[in-house]
Amino acid sequence: MNPFSLSCVALKFSAARLTGQNKELSILKRLSSRNAEPEDSQGAHTIRLLDYFEVRGPNGVHEVIVTEVVLGWNEMRYSAVALPPVRKVTAELALGLAHIHNCDIVHGDLHVGNIGFRMNGFDQVDEFQVLQAIDAVTDQFCYPVISENLEMNVAGLPTYIVSSDNKIGWMAALCDVDRLTALIMDFGEAFVEPEAPSKPNIMFYLQPPELLLNLQPLSKAGDIWAFGCTVSELVLRWPLFANILNEKELLKRMVATLGPLPREWQLDNALAWLNLDDDDVQLITAGQKDQGYMLDRVALSWFRSVTEIPPSAQVIEDTQALFSMLSALLQFEPKSRPPIDEVLKHPWLRQFTTRDTAV
């Protein structure tokens, strides 16, 4: 089933199961079936399913998903390899999300940790070159697995584990790190609409307000909210709603960042569930923004990263466009957030969703 004939692939082992099939596998199959060509402008920005199989172990049957090898955002950001421009990454993620939504799929867990980068030319590298590069830059160690509890049944444990390798080091030695393509990966929490899970497993600080207040299940609009938070984090290099300890604080931070909640929302049950006192309720209903948290800081951060002195009229216009896009993505009311196909046409992204431009 591997049409790309890669010499190096990534394996993802699911937890052991008794019956049924891995949900992530069915989602990846659905995405693949809607892709006529691997270089499709939208489908090229989601992880590629290459193959799948099952293995039986002491804990049951494990489904194994075979995909291309990519670099993760988190390993890239702490390396010496320069990250691609945020605007280009955002446009490519928007293309990937459009492909996902056009397949009637909700990703359900979009954040920077689920951003991958495909390295140009890696599919042309043969196995011998890979082994040479790994041997040259990687020091790996094997560690025995020993239970601290002598009475524990260790039949289901491996006899040893291997330390993770310096993947970015040996991949960078083989490929052009200046040409990276951003994509969306990890579909373990994805689902086909309208089959939303009753208790979605989503990053705490990325919960859309309708989910936080238990007003509406997760949906494509929730992905749009997460996309807005993710773009903000790409710019700031820090989560938009950072240093939050609980749901009450998250709601207060949302209001401080975005203003008042919609008046038509029935919040009596939600406010009681969040254990808000009178001062909290007054603050939230007043909807007073806090200058230290407003969206302006995201646009200003991007402006500082790209501007020349004095700033050109184009840079100022682009900064205003970024602010308007984030303001649209991060609307409290789900139905007020634009669908991803409209986001692709936004002035801040439009030129990058039709051609590969690194600005």
Where in this protein do the model-derived segments appear?
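Intrinsically disordered, low-complexity regulatory segments of kinases
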Residues: 1-359
